[in-house]
From Swiss-Prot:
The lineage of its organism: Eukaryota, Fungi, Dikarya, Ascomycota, Saccharomycotina. The gene is PRP3. It is found in: Nucleus. This is U4/U6 small nuclear ribonucleoprotein PRP3. The keyword Nucleus applies. Its main location: nucleus.
Length: 469
């Protein structure tokens, strides 16, 4: 039995040895020349590329065409790139051929640019024409999707032919042939009108002939448009108002003087005073009784003064009345009233009383302020809208300094009052369905019973609490 071949197991160290050869390359000692190598396959000498295991060496050394198993005599790629270049031959450009080709390319490019410019200009003109047609209503506006409401021309032609070329609202006055019915003939009148014309003696037939369709049309009344311009009120300064009043009075005085000169108005009596009574009557008549004349002048002066005072009083009353009416018109009666109740220990300081009174008047509050004697405790009730009551609460609770000392002015002299123990507190806040207060007033009561009776007149005695004071 021959010894075991340890190299056939594929030991890599042994295979890389220079003394190692594959089994198919080992020569056999035989006398047969035909069998030079031992192995399976064709009895052909192996290619030299198969004798090396270095692939990089094979790739550099051998070409594809040299491999008889891979080479193709009809394959042009088997030759090298240099051989292919020589097979094509050398081609030389003629003189001016390159410049001519470049000029042709430039000319072609210029023509393409001109055509593109013409196309853009034509497209812009088409867009303008299309926009005009859309504005005139000849084409639908695609942005508003008007194309969805286009009329089908085929259906419209059938409709147009069936109605003899008239609209649907005119078909009621046409016969089957598409002609106007006899009773609606514009050249004549209807049978009902002819019968009515026989009963009436005077009938104006010309109007019916000229306007025969008026009797079938309901004409609406033309709307009257007020073309009067709305005048914007101008707000003037005090100096401008004075100048305007002065000029207006001057123009009225000049107009009155012109009427007196023309005799349209009687001449006014002279304004006689004690200082000018002699000069007034020197030109008219002699004074026989100066004492009586002096009495007449004094009576005229008193009369003018009395009229002047009465006129001022009347204007003052009218102004007050207008202001009250304006306030009543602007102020709406609320559904509920906001009410706040405060109780204090002392209200001798006249500055505090003035602030309470003036703020209640300016804020249009209703209610009262009662106190027991000048140096006693009291109560404040205010009723109004929520904003005014909130402002008044801020005044009473934060802005007014109740514990601030002050000097009380009396007939005997000034007395310094110590108010460090004085204070005020809010006892109640809420809403009232009805308000019995007509306005806001202040009152000094002699005792607590008198204060409660005053509150009872307005159903407010439950607001007062002696414990708080």
């Amino acid at each position: 039995m021959p010894p075991r071949n340890t190299y056939e197991k594929g030991n890599p160290k042994r295979q890389n040895s220079p003394y190692y050869k594959p089994s198919f390359l080992r020569r056999e000692e035989t006398t047969n020349d035909e069998e030079k190598f031992q192995g399976h396959g064709l009895k052909t000498e192996l290619h030299s590329a198969l004798k090396s295991s270095n692939l990089n060496l094979i790739r550099r050394t051998y070409q594809t065409g040299e491999n008889p198993y891979l080479s193709d005599p009809h394959d042009r790629g088997s030759s090298s790139r240099f051989n292919r270049r020589y097979e094509r031959g050398l081609k030389f450009y003629q003189k001016g051929e390159i410049s001519k080709r470049i000029a042709q390319e430039r000319t072609l490019q210029k023509q393409q640019e001109e055509e593109e410019l013409k196309r853009k200009l034509k497209q812009e003109e088409d867009e303008k024409d299309k926009r005009k047609l859309i504005e005139s209503g000849d084409l639908p506006n695609l942005e508003l999707h008007e194309d969805k409401f286009l009329l089908d021309l085929s259906k419209f032609k059938i409709y147009y032919d069936n109605n003899h070329g008239y609209e649907w609202w005119d078909t009621a006055y046409l016969d089957e042939k598409g002609e106007l019915m006899e009773k609606y003939d514009m050249n004549g009148t209807s049978p009902a009108e002819e019968k009515l014309a026989e009963d009436i003696d005077e009938v104006d037939d010309d109007d019916d002939d000229e306007h025969p369709s008026i009797r079938y049309v309901a004409h609406p009344l033309p709307e009257k448009i007020n073309e009067a311009k709305v005048s914007i009120k101008a707000y003037l300064t005090q100096h401008e108002r004075k100048r305007l009043r002065r000029n207006r009075r001057k123009m009225a005085r000049e107009a009155r003087e012109i009427k007196i000169k023309l005799g349209l108005l009687p001449k006014p009596e002279p304004k006689v005073k004690l200082s000018n009574m002699m000069s007034v009557f020197e030109n008219d008549q002699n004074i026989t009784d100066p004492t009586a004349w002096e009495k007449v002048v004094k009576d005229q002066v008193d009369l003018r003064k009395r009229k002047h005072l009465e006129e001022n009083e009347r204007r003052h009353e009218d102004a007050i009345k207008r202001r009250k009416e304006a306030v009543n018109m602007n102020v709406e009666k609320p559904t509920v009233y906001h009410c706040k109740v405060f109780q204090f220990k002392n209200l001798q300081n006249p500055k505090i009383r003035f602030k309470l009174k003036m703020n209640s008047k300016e804020l249009s509050l209703k209610g009262l302020c009662l106190r027991i004697r000048d140096d006693g405790p009291g109560i404040i009730i205010v009723v109004g809208n929520e904003k005014s009551c909130k402002f008044y609460e801020n005044l009473v609770m934060k802005r007014i300094k109740w514990n601030e000392d002050f000097e009380l002015h009396t007939n005997t002299g000034d007395i310094k009052m110590d108010m460090h123990n004085n204070s005020i507190s809010k006892t109640w806040e809420g809403y009232l369905q009805d308000c019995k207060f007509k306005g806001w007033f202040m009152k000094v009561c002699n005792d607590q019973d008198s204060l409660l009776r005053t509150l009872g007149q307005f159903d407010s005695e439950h607001f007062y609490s002696p414990v708080q004071t």
